[in-house]
UniProtKB/Swiss-Prot annotation:
Ranges in a coiled coil: none
The name this protein goes by in its record: Anaerobic nitrite reductase GLB0
Gene responsible for this protein: GLB0
EC number annotated for this UniProt entry: 1.7.2.-
Keyword Transport in record: yes
Record field: catalytic activity: Fe(III)-heme b-[protein] + nitric oxide + H2O = Fe(II)-heme b-[protein] + nitrite + 2 H(+)
InterPro entries named among the record's database cross-references: Globin, Globin-like_sf, Globin/Proto, Leghaemoglobin-like, Leghaemoglobin_Fe_BS
Binding, heme b: 66, 80, 84, 114, 118-119
Amino acid sequence: MASAVVNQSEAAAVRAPSKPVKTYSKENEQLVKQSWEILKKDAQRNGINFFRKVFEIAPGAKAMYSFLRDSTIPFEENPKVKNHARYVFMMTGDAAVQLGEKGAYQVLESKLQKLAATHVNAGVTDDQFEIVKEAILYAIEMGVPDLWSPELKSAWGDAYDMLAEQVKAEMHAQRSAATS
């Protein structure tokens, strides 16, 4: 994988300015934080729900995960799926709760280049981020059904959009650097 990763200084040199940042209100911040306190207690189950929904919407996405391609282990029993699902769900939630304090770029900065490179190498496209958004909102709804509301959906949707825009911008920068 290291050979496929773009020289980071080249990517930084061509990084396009990100789109205008959505406003992340105090109300949204509170809704996300309140629900995250509950969601993170069962991050593995919520992460499994998230990935189950991704693969329901886009069954071909399984091919992007080396640990699923040739596995005969049932999805929900696969220890690699469990670990990855928990990691992705925790990273997304932990980043979302920090948005009000730091902004999307600062929240992701330390992980952004590696995260983008992983997605570039897997062949992820911008439109696939919408599938992930639908799946993460589904997992949150399943994880906190008593709190779920249009306002909570909007708060998490805005948080996801802000984070996804930063990842996509870095992916574009890395792809541009690789072709120049």
